[in-house]
Swiss-Prot record:
Organism annotation: Hahella chejuensis (strain KCTC 2396)
Its EC number(s): 6.1.1.15
Protein's name in the database: Proline--tRNA ligase
This protein's record includes keyword Lipid metabolism: no
Domain observations: Consists of three domains: the N-terminal catalytic domain, the editing domain and the C-terminal anticodon-binding domain.
Length: 574
């Protein structure tokens, strides 16, 4: 491609509404332009990257045995009503009416459509397993679209759905897709982690997320220093190093703590570390018909954070997790939040495993402005229920017994689920088994945010000059930059010759034949993030050399004209 005939729409200034670095650089590099909130036009440069991501995904999906289909973006409401999600999905589902006043939605996902298709097309267990995928624009009406492509309302996604006669078959395909995803993200050239995950609103049993590691990531993931264990913060199991609490060494005493309503202020007031305190959080339980919801107490170590996903899954706890109001707390306990503790608390109480091994701790006294010190389980307060209630922290033991956990930020770009019969049962998607009996199919669901991968790659790879692409995703692999080619026949002829050789070798090359100053060309190539740059000049050619510089390199290197093409091919493994 010749730069003189290509839309290079770079910007010198960063638009004011671009918050994260990927959004800033995609705008400045001329990859995208905003049309409306959460809606973007992909310019030629950005589309090249998007297509490279898409091509790798498609190649590996085909290799895995999945079959490509293309389903309508607009879906009839009847299917969503049948699955039960028409009302459940919430405001992100864009609902529309056609001219006949029939209800439709713009698809954020396609479980209903694919289930309807397969229940009409597949009739026998002999046709299973079957796996279908598409790469298609989706729409979710985000309340607050932000971060550019990272959280847009319209986005390109690869979604795949598999169908099975039994759980064993689903388990096999799940691992096939897990392995395919691992190959995909490896081919992208990104630093990523597959992690155990919660299935969330889509439902199902087993679930893994694929995260690109980046300091700007919104998600925290935990992984072991000595094994392959990895999980997102919602899912990671928190272990304690102690099996039981040490023996009491202090007497329980009540102390006045006027105005101290937080763990931080109580710790400072009593001059002790937060890990020697416990906090008691009150949430609503499941209500019986005609009765108010009961209140349940959750007790954690003062320095730990409640994991709301874990808490929500506790038997008897209302879903979604709802904290009790101050009025309900005062009515049930007799004091306001900030002075509540587990001693003589007239509520069902669940103690986190790490809090359950504390001794001589501090907690609220269930009296306004009062706390208890020297509290010990058993002697002062009975434990009836324990559970894993907290987020893991760095240094926790790895749940597989190998090493300790470290926490890093990640950007979720892929997700695989075992859906089971969540949709197939609701929509009566059955096949005849080997005995001629109708059996509900088991399903798997596998998604990759194709456009989100582009933003995640930038969040992981950039510097103060611009984007640093991995070779596999770069819009062009090589920038060929001739200096003064419009006045120098020697430079122009050698540039054209090298350009032709690189194209012949299958290299994705951009010839910067614009009549621009060298500094402008260099700055734009670095902003765009082309991994390899070759500069051709009169001075270099006089010595039979050109100048090479990798995007990650600090200094440039001179090499002979005759060797540069093979050097590039070797770099790119062509």
């Amino acid at each position: 491609m010749r730069a003189s005939r290509y839309l290079i729409a770079t910007l010198k200034e960063t638009p004011a509404d671009a918050e994260v670095i990927s959004h800033q650089l995609m705008l400045r590099a001329g990859m995208i332009r905003k049309l409306a909130a959460g809606l973007y036009t992909w310019l030629p440069l950005g589309l090249r990257v998007l297509k490279k991501v898409e091509n790798i995904v498609r190649e590996e999906m085909d290799r895995s045995g999945a079959q490509e289909v293309l389903m309508p973006a607009v879906q009839p409401a009847e299917l969503w009503i049948e699955s039960g999600r028409w009302e459940q999905y919430g405001g992100e589902l864009l609902r529309i009416h056609d001219r006949h006043n029939r209800d439709f939605c713009v698809g954020p996902t396609h479980e209903e459509v694919i289930t309807d298709l397969i229940r009409n097309e597949l009739k026998s267990y002999k046709q299973l397993p079957a796996n279908f995928y598409q790469i298609q624009m989706k729409f979710r009406d985000e309340r607050r679209p932000r971060f550019g492509i990272m959280r847009a309302r319209e986005f390109l996604m690869k979604d795949a759905y598999s169908f099975h006669v039994n759980q064993e078959s689903l388990d096999e395909t799940y691992m096939v897709m897990y392995d395919a995803y691992t190959r995909i993200f490896t081919r992208f050239g990104l630093d990523f982690r597959p992690v155990q995950a919660d299935s969330g609103s889509i439902g199902g049993s087993s679930s893994h997320e694929f995260h690109v590691l980046a300091n700007s990531g919104e998600d925290l993931i935990a992984f072991s220093t000595e094994s392959d264990y990895a999980a997102n913060l919602e899912k990671a199991e928190a272990l304690t190093t102690l099996k039981q609490a040490p023996a009491p060494s202090k007497d329980m005493a009540k102390v006045a703590t006027p105005g101290q309503r937080t763990i931080e202020s109580v710790s400072e007031f009593l001059n002790l570390p937060a890990e020697q305190t416990v906090k008691t959080l009150l949430v609503l339980g499941e209500a019986e018909e005609g009765k108010p919801a009961p209140i349940i107490a959750l007790v954690l170590r003062g320095d730990h954070v409640l994991n709301e996903i874990k808490a929500e899954k506790l038997p008897g706890v209302a879903s979604p997790l709802t904290f009790a109001s101050d009025e309900a707390i005062e009515a049930a306990v007799g004091c306001k939040p900030g002075s509540i503790g587990p001693v003589n608390l007239p509520l069902r109480t669940i103690v986190d495993n790490s809090a359950a091994v504390l001794a001589n701790f501090v907690c609220g006294a269930n009296e306004e402005g009062q706390h208890l010190t020297g509290v010990n389980w058993g002697r002062d307060c009975e434990i009836k229920e324990t559970a894993d209630l907290r987020n893991v922290v760095e240094g926790d033991l790895s749940p597989d017994g190998k090493g300790v956990l470290v926490l890093k930020k990640g950007i979720e770009v892929g997700h695989v689920f075992k859906l089971g019969d969540k949709y197939s049962s609701a929509m009566n998607a059955t096949v005849l088994d080997e005995n001629g009996k109708a059996t509900v199919m088991q399903m798997g669901c596998y998604g990759i945010g194709v456009s989100r991968v582009v933003a995640a790659a930038i969040e992981q790879g950039h510097d103060d000059k611009g984007i640093i692409w991995p070779d596999a995703l770069a819009p062009f692999e090589v920038a060929l930059v001739p200096l003064n080619m419009h006045k120098s026949d020697v430079v122009r002829e050698k540039a054209e010759s090298l350009y032709a050789e690189l194209l012949q070798a299958g290299v994705d090359v951009l010839l910067d034949d614009r009549n621009e100053r060298p500094g402008v060309k260099f700055a734009e190539m670095e902003l765009i993030g082309i991994p390899h740059r070759v500069v051709i000049s009169d001075r270099g050619l006089a010595e039979g050399k050109v100048e090479y510089k990798g995007r990650r390199d600090t200094d440039s290197t001179d090499m002979t004209v005759d060797t540069v093409v093979n050097f590039i091919k070797e770099k790119l493994k062509k």
